[in-house]
Design a protein with these regions (language model features):
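Terminal, regulation- and interaction-focused segments at domain boundaries
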Residues: 18-31, 63-96
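Extracytosolic low-complexity repeat regions of secreted or lipid-anchored proteins
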Residues: 82-152
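Sec-dependent N-terminal signal peptides
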Residues: 1-4
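Bacterial signal peptide processing site
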Residues: 13-16
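C-terminal motif of bacterial Sec signal peptides marking the signal peptidase cleavage site
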Residues: 7-11
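Compositionally biased P/S/T/G-rich terminal and signal peptide-adjacent segments
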Residues: 31-76
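Short, charged, intrinsically disordered terminal tails
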Residues: 151-159
Length: 159
């Protein structure tokens, strides 16, 4: 069971207590949202090192709700590695990367090991890092884009 801890790290010291904005000033298209999500995951895995395997393809799309309450779609990407590094050092490294991207990073309380979740910024909706013995994983959700997840999935299958 994961519980949200009282430990929150804010990306900008000058904005103590303020959460980074999740609103984009310009809309993003499906390809950009997907590519950016992949880049954010790749940046984290490169910094953490090791052999990461895809568990959920970055082509996986699901429904989400736009800030206008309309229907949207987002990409999901999950990678994992079976050999673990230094769990605490990896959690600190991942958090530092995401804070530098303007994201708010929260540490979740989990008996298995460090669990970090980052939100905000303008690159992904959410990215999570779980440093559990023998099973480190990173999961990212792209920004929510205008569109229908089922239609996007059908287009991928056709194309």
């Amino acid at each position: 069971m994961l519980l949200l801890s009282a430990v929150t790290t804010v990306g900008c010291a000058g904005q103590r207590g303020a959460a980074p904005s999740t609103e984009r000033t310009t809309p993003v298209d499906a390809d950009t949202a997907q590519r950016t999500m992949i880049d954010v995951v790749d940046q984290a895995t490169a910094a953490l090192g090791g052999e990461w395997e895809t568990r959920t393809s970055p082509d996986y799309v699901e429904s989400c709700q736009l800030s206008s309450n309309g229907e949207g779609a987002r990409w999901v990407y999950r990678v994992a590695r079976s050999e673990s590094g230094d769990a605490e050092a990896d959690a600190v490294a991942a958090s530092g990367i995401w804070r530098s991207d303007g994201m708010r990073v929260d540490r979740l309380v989990d008996a298995k090991g460090p669990a970090m979740v980052a939100r905000g910024g303008d690159r992904v909706d959410t990215i999570r890092f779980f440093a559990f013995p023998g099973n480190d994983s990173i999961q990212a959700l792209s920004l929510c884009i205008a569109g229908d997840a089922d239609e996007i999935e059908e287009q991928q299958a056709d194309g």
